[in-house]
Amino acid sequence: MDIVFALGGSVLMPKDGASAENIKSYAQVFKKLKDMGHNVSIVVGGGNTAREYIKVSREFTNESVCDEIGIMATRMNAMLLISALSKYSVNFVPTNFKDAEMILNLGKILVMGGTHPAHTTDAVSATLAEFTNADLLVIATNVDGVYTKDPRTNNDAKKLEKMTTKELIEITGSNSISAGSSSVVDSLASKIIDRAKLKTIVVKGTPDEILKSVLGGHDGTIIIP
């Protein structure tokens, strides 16, 4: 199966900082899936690293430059994961899909970050899934699925176990597109998922849930075209 993972930067690089053991635990999951015969592509977010740099840079520059800074952070995070994957990947972070395709053609795990200003890594992962005709897109984030509202700030938020791409667009339509903004799935990604008719699963970004998103038994949200 061809699988694209959107790996949230905040789960790979949590607020308490970088941890070699944490990064290794994600690498082990992706290695296992590769050993099982799956083609694995990973788009890594910028997380707290990106947001801290963007917060500072916003004091003296515009959103487009902040976007570029955020993209650089995603690529640093991608390089960390590549290092942990060792021979399973290649020592290179592609910046476009043609280079990404070459890595997949080598039979390696593809790891990349952002590509264009104003595009989140969710949008990049959805576009990559469309480009590669992936069988599954997995969005691994800091909440355990899609909710009617942000569960971190709304006690009455209800989790959705299954939904359509059209329903996803309705929920995500008002999300911010400022540099460093974060939501479970952003509005552009939702539209690409709908356009490409991608089977998508949103899960809590733990190694165990990521594995279950492929093998079964996950506790996330299934999005169907």
From Swiss-Prot:
UMP binds at residues 46, 67, 115-121. GO terms for molecular function: ATP binding; UMP kinase activity. InterPro entries: AceGlu_kinase-like_sf, Asp/Glu/Uridylate_kinase, Glu/AcGlu_kinase, Uridylate_kinase, Uridylate_kinase_arch/spir. Its EC number is 2.7.4.22. The keyword Transferase applies. GO terms for biological process: 'de novo' CTP biosynthetic process; UDP biosynthetic process. Coiled coil: none annotated. ATP binds at residues 9-10, 47, 51, 141-142, 147, 150. It is found in: Cytoplasm. Inhibited by UTP. Catalyzes the reversible phosphorylation of UMP to UDP. Homohexamer. This is Uridylate kinase. It comes from Methanococcus vannielii (strain ATCC 35089 / DSM 1224 / JCM 13029 / OCM 148 / SB).
